[in-house]
């Protein structure tokens, strides 16, 4: 079973959930999760919790405890907040390059699913009639302690956008498309660790939208430098085979560029300098 995770404390999450139920034929089941109704459509369930999802480490275990199955993949339907209040549709995997400021553990990473995130970008971009930004975000926040692949898909960046009906529809349709197609998409994409650039990963986003690269974890410039151990830890937390390390050269620190280059060589991965 595939899981779409939502929370009552997030207006964007509730917006997306309502659109999923209205537009895609999800039906309420007799099951509950964290005291909330579970909705089902084919092999996809919508689960709802009562607190911020970024703190929900071991969610996969909790699903198994409460519902008796281990999910194949978890899509977190969420809001994105930023001071700039940039209207945006974003996707990313969770993890902490350093200290855990917002959920998860220090220097720990969730399992990335690059094909699902790439398909999310492509579908959001195709459906985006709002004129908003569509982009990756760098790896950040929790949860990190999950043993099944997961990704966040978000409406940003202020309440005005979180409750926007069309944004809710776009994300709902994107999630359904991605969960139906990510396994088929795998063979067409080149999976990469992304390094460099700002939080919204402009170069990685462009490469994913225009070419065959599919990014998992993304290390932005503001989180650099990291140790060799941390970079290897991130590389080991991909649910799909990593084929390349991509570096936004100008958007990276010198020591991080060199570390990426030497690791690519050592691990037999393609090194892509942009």
UniProtKB/Swiss-Prot annotation:
Its cofactor is Zn(2+). It holds the Pfam family tRNA_deacylase. InterPro entries: Deacylase_DtdA_archaea, DtdA. It comes from the Archaea. GO terms for biological process: D-amino acid catabolic process. Keywords: Hydrolase, Metal-binding, Zinc. Binds 2 Zn(2+) ions per subunit. Its EC number is 3.1.1.96. It catalyses: a D-aminoacyl-tRNA + H2O = a tRNA + a D-alpha-amino acid + H(+); glycyl-tRNA(Ala) + H2O = tRNA(Ala) + glycine + H(+). SUPFAM superfamilies: AF0625-like. Gene3D superfamilies: AF0625-like (3.40.630.50). GO terms for molecular function: D-aminoacyl-tRNA deacylase activity; zinc ion binding. Belongs to the DtdA deacylase family. HAMAP family: Deacylase_DtdA (MF_00562). PANTHER family: D-AMINOACYL-TRNA DEACYLASE. Monomer. D-aminoacyl-tRNA deacylase with broad substrate specificity. By recycling D-aminoacyl-tRNA to D-amino acids and free tRNA molecules, this enzyme counteracts the toxicity associated with the formation of D-aminoacyl-tRNA entities in vivo. This is D-aminoacyl-tRNA deacylase. It comes from Pyrococcus horikoshii (strain ATCC 700860 / DSM 12428 / JCM 9974 / NBRC 100139 / OT-3). The gene is dtdA.
């Amino acid at each position: 079973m595939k899981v779409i995770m939502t929370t009552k404390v997030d207006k964007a999450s509730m917006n997306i959930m309502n659109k999923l139920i209205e537009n895609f034929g999800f039906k309420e089941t007799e099951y509950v999760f964290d005291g909330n109704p579970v909705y089902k459509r084919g092999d996809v369930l919508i689960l709802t919790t009562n607190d911020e999802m970024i703190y929900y480490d071991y969610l996969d275990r909790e699903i198994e405890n409460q519902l008796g199955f281990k999910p194949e993949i978890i899509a977190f339907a969420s809001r994105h907040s930023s001071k700039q209040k940039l209207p945006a549709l974003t996707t990313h995997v969770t993890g902490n390059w350093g200290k855990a400021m917002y959920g998860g553990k220090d220097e720990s990473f969730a399992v990335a699913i690059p094909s699902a995130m790439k398909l999310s970008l492509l579908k959001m971009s195709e459906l985006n009639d709002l004129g908003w930004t569509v982009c990756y975000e760098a790896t950040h926040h929790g949860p990190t302690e999950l043993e099944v692949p997961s990704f966040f898909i978000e409406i940003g960046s202020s309440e005005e956008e979180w409750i926007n009906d069309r944004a809710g529809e776009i994300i709902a349709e994107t999630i359904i498309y991605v969960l139906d197609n990510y396994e088929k998409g795998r063979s067409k994409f080149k999976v990469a660790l992304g390094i460099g650039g700002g939080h919204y990963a402009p170069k990685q986003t462009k490469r994913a939208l225009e070419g065959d690269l599919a990014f998992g974890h993304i290390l932005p410039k503001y989180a650099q430098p990291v140790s060799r151990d941390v970079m290897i830890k991130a590389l080991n937390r991909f649910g799909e085979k990593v084929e390349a390390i991509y570096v936004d050269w100008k958007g990276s620190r010198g020591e991080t560029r060199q570390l990426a280059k030497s690791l690519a060589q050592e691990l037999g991965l393609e090194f892509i300098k942009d």
